UniProtKB/Swiss-Prot annotation:
It is found in: Mitochondrion. This is Large ribosomal subunit protein bL34m. The keyword Nucleotide-binding does not apply. One of its GO terms (cellular component) is mitochondrial inner membrane. Disulfide bonds: none annotated. Keywords: Mitochondrion, Ribonucleoprotein, Ribosomal protein, Transit peptide. Component of the mitochondrial large ribosomal subunit (mt-LSU). Mature yeast 74S mitochondrial ribosomes consist of a small (37S) and a large (54S) subunit. The 37S small subunit contains a 15S ribosomal RNA (15S mt-rRNA) and 34 different proteins. The 54S large subunit contains a 21S rRNA (21S mt-rRNA) and 46 different proteins. GO terms for biological process: mitochondrial translation. Component of the mitochondrial ribosome (mitoribosome), a dedicated translation machinery responsible for the synthesis of mitochondrial genome-encoded proteins, including at least some of the essential transmembrane subunits of the mitochondrial respiratory chain. The mitoribosomes are attached to the mitochondrial inner membrane and translation products are cotranslationally integrated into the membrane. Belongs to the bacterial ribosomal protein bL34 family. The lineage of its organism: Eukaryota, Fungi, Dikarya, Ascomycota, Saccharomycotina. Residues 1-16 form a transit peptide.
Length: 105
């Protein structure tokens, strides 16, 4: 019997234990008594397990945040940029004294 046909049939002969009869959706469904007694300023004292994890991603993008640009790198950290500023010329001097072959990018 194909898998799809088995999934579509009702599972009447299957035995459920007390653990498997618990539904995660029942936790997410608000109780009517809770809604009547709560004020708009009060927040619920508990958050159901997994409530915030449904369909939520922590970050927008993953792994594509660094997009290197040679032009920007040389403009920011290049020799001419170092030579123009007072602090940059100190960096060039320090690297030259240390014996670096490459003073900047």
């Amino acid at each position: 019997m194909p898998l799809f046909a088995r999934l579509c049939q009702p599972q009447s002969r299957r035995m459920f234990s007390s653990i498997s009869s618990f539904s995660a959706l029942s936790v997410l469904r608000p109780q009517t008594g809770m809604l009547l007694n709560s004020s708009p300023l009060k927040t619920p004292s508990f958050t159901p397990l997994g409530f915030g994890l449904i369909g939520q991603r922590r970050w927008k993008s993953r792994g594509n945040t660094y997009q290197p640009s040679t032009l920007k790198r040389k403009r920011t950290f290049g020799f001419l940029a170092r030579a123009k500023s007072k602090q940059g010329s100190k960096i060039l001097k320090r690297r030259k004294l240390k014996g670096r072959w490459f003073l900047s990018h």
